[in-house]
Structures are given as structure tokens and as C-alpha cells.
Amino acid sequence: MNLTPKEIVKFLDDYVIGQKKAKKIIAIALRNRYRRMQLSPELQDDIVPKNILMIGSTGVGKTEIARRLAKMMGFPFIKIEASKYTEVGFVGRDVESMVRDLTNAALNLVKNEQREKNKDKINEFIENKILEKLLPPLPKGISDEKQEEYKNSLEKMRTKLRNGDLDESTIEIEISQNMFDTNPNLPPEMGAMQDIVKVIGVGSKKVKKEMKIKDAKNALKNEAGEKILDQESIKSEALKRSENEGIIFIDEIDKIAVSSGNSNRQDPSKEGVQRDLLPIVEGSNVQTKIGTLKTDHILFIAAGAFHLSKPSDLIPELQGRFPLRVELDSLDDKAFYEILTRPKNSLLKQYSQLLKTENLELDFDNEAIKEIAKIASRANEEMQDIGARRLHTVIEKLLEDLSFEADEYAGKKFVVDKKMVEEKLGDIIENKDLARYIL
């Protein structure tokens, strides 16, 4: 999607309140990707993305900015936590696995696009598979009259199938089952082995299962995709997108910084993780199940609160790989008010729509919204600052009884006013010990 930086920021304004500096820097970084692709291949190789370091408390919009943009522009995107990785040689996930996770995200993205483009062919394949079970093909040498009868019956059955009239009927189908797919605890590094066993036919078998037709349609989608879609071109496109459009969001990078003021270094592998991360961010080749991926042009966005450490506590080489730094603003009551009123799918709209399913019309008057914003802001000041996430706990507590008794208000309109907010939350916010547990 070809958007100017201003258009990108305008899009983000619908979902993330404030944080103009962060939006501007990320918008420029994404636009530079488009600019790079317009250049000659020789120049493209030399121009590397300027990675970004976002500094700010939890809940101020760091992840949301990157995730919204990646989704809108159709870029492969993953969010990982730096603290979950271990130095090579230690038990745990190594940093290269984040690149493999990115290729998996790209693979799913491209597969879904191809499935959408070829949905008519895929649906036809699924229909034919199901119709074969409902109306087995005629043997050879049957008269023309019988063939015509069969053809008419087949079309009638096809119409019923498309209309959903047969959804509750039960059929027996054969589906492929991979022994690796049945174990959710296998690490992603097993991807290469899964590909090998698929090629040689070990570990995969056809199993017969009885199920309703509506379930059979979903079960046959993967098989249809494997048969109809060009798997090699999908892998090639996924690899290309990972390299040129991939975004890896590294959260909690402050957790692997070794604080200069902390003489008791409890985790000596922190610096090791940084050193393992360095070649990935600098640009290196990583083996994935879809091929060798060059990380030179992946955009890395690192983020952290840096309460107990500073960006300068990261090793100098890694600091140099994140030249763009932006500090995100903490959220006050005015920002909370905007968060509750401005976004397309604001929190209040979400709760209103949820209760609408119970035939209850929920509304908030303006003074009530201001009071909610004040209480959330105060809770963040007096307790740990968790940013906009505080609004979730505040509103949940406010609407707890109403959500529980929603059926009693069916067909009515319920307006939340300032008085109700004060009654439900006033005593709690005044009692700091109680507030720590509830809000």
C-alpha cells in the first residue's frame, strides 16, 4: 500500500491517541521502504532500514502503533519479548527463532491471500470431494439416460450443498494427519524436519473420520490449498516479503540490558542474548523452512520501559543498530478521555456493543467519561503506571453488576452518569490498599 507519511499518521490517529513523535518516525521508516523499492537493485542493497528504539511505560501505545500499521499495509509482523530468549548454549529459545517466526507469519499471510484469490477453485474442489461421498461416481458403460439422471441428481445435490441444506448431514472423509501437528509442544525449529518428513512420506497418514458436512468443509480446506495453490511460489513470495517488508517488534529489550548500577548481575546471559541479537539486527543469513533468509532489510523496532536500566546500558554495538530513538508520553486524564471517545472501536463502544447482544442499550454521559478518565489517571499515579490498560480494569469494575444482571434490563436504555461512577469507584480509589487489589 502506497501511503505518504501524513496519510500513515492520519490512519494511526484513529486507533492510537497522542504519541505524535513515535507515529512520525515509524511513518517515515515505512515510507522509506517504498522509496527504496523504487531504486536500482544495486542501490537497494546498500540502503538499510533505520531501526527504532521506543522508550515508554507499558500501555502507552508502543506495540499498537507497529501492529496496526503492519496489519493495514499487509506486512509480515511478529512481536516477541527479548526476555524470553537465551544465549546460545543455554536451555531455551535462541534469537534466530524470531526470524523463523517471521517467515511463518509471512507464509500464513501469502497463503491467505492466495486462498482468497483462488477461493472459487478451492470451494469447487471441496464441493467435488463431498459430492463424491454423497453420490459416488457411476461405473463405466452406463447408458446415456442413466448418466443424464446422475448429472441432474448431482446438480441438485450441489445446490443443496451450497445453500447449506446438507450441513448437518454426516459423511466419512479421508484427511491427512501429520504426527507433528498433533503435538503443540514441539518447538518451531522442528519446521525443517516437518518439511523433510512430508517429502519422504514419513509421519503423515490418511485417516478416515466421520463428521458433519459443515465441519468437513473446513477440514478439507488445507488439502484443497495444498493441491490447488503453487506451494513453491508461495514460499518464494513469503521469503521475499519477510526480507523486504518484515517487521520484528522486540518488546522488553530493557530486560536484557545490564544496569550499570547493579553490581549483582543475577543473569550473566543477558549480555550474551544481546551479542546473539547483534548479527540478526546487523544483517545475516538465517536458515528457515522456506529457505535462507537475509535479515539485512528487516525493520526492527525495539521497545522498553527502561525503569531499572537505561538505553546506554545496552552493549554499544547494539545501541548503534537502533539509531532512531523516541520517548513516548505518559497518559494523563485528558489522554484517557480521548482514548475513551475518539478511536473507531473505543473501549466504551466495545462494551456498548457487547451488551447490545442482550437487547440492552448502554450509554455514557460526558461527565461520567471524564470521571472514568480521572480515576484511571489517578490509579496510575498512585500505583504502578500501566497506561491505557488501566481503563480495562476500571471499566470492568464499573460495569461488573450491570454485566451480571444484563438480562433484567433487556429492552431498556441504561445511562452511566457521574454519580454512578463515583458510587462504584469512589470508595475504592480513596482506599489505596483496596485499590491495589481491585484496580
From Swiss-Prot:
Single GO cellular component annotation? HslUV protease complex
Q: Where in the cell is it found?
A: Cytoplasm
Residues that, per the record, bind ATP? 17, 59-64, 251, 317, 389
Annotated GO molecular function terms are: ATP binding; ATP hydrolysis activity; peptidase activity; proteasome-activating activity
- Keyword check for Cytoplasm: yes
Q: Which UniProt keywords apply?
A: ATP-binding, Chaperone, Cytoplasm, Nucleotide-binding, Stress response
BP term (GO), one: proteolysis involved in protein catabolic process
Q: Give the highest taxon in the source lineage.
A: Bacteria
Which InterPro entries does the entry mention?
Answer: AAA+_ATPase, ATP-dep_Clp_protease_ClpX, ATPase_AAA_core, Clp_ATPase_C, HslU, P-loop_NTPase
Q: Major location, coarse class?
A: cytoplasm
HAMAP family in UniProt: HslU
Q: What functional role does this protein have? A: ATPase subunit of a proteasome-like degradation complex; this subunit has chaperone activity. The binding of ATP and its subsequent hydrolysis by HslU are essential for unfolding of protein substrates subsequently hydrolyzed by HslV. HslU recognizes the N-terminal part of its protein substrates and unfolds these before they are guided to HslV for hydrolysis.
The annotated subunit structure for this chain is: A double ring-shaped homohexamer of HslV is capped on each side by a ring-shaped HslU homohexamer. The assembly of the HslU/HslV complex is dependent on binding of ATP.
In the record, the note on similarity to other proteins reads:
Belongs to the ClpX chaperone family. HslU subfamily.
This chain's protein is named: ATP-dependent protease ATPase subunit HslU
Organism from which the protein derives: Campylobacter jejuni subsp. doylei (strain ATCC BAA-1458 / RM4099 / 269.97)
Which gene holds the coding sequence for this protein?
hslU
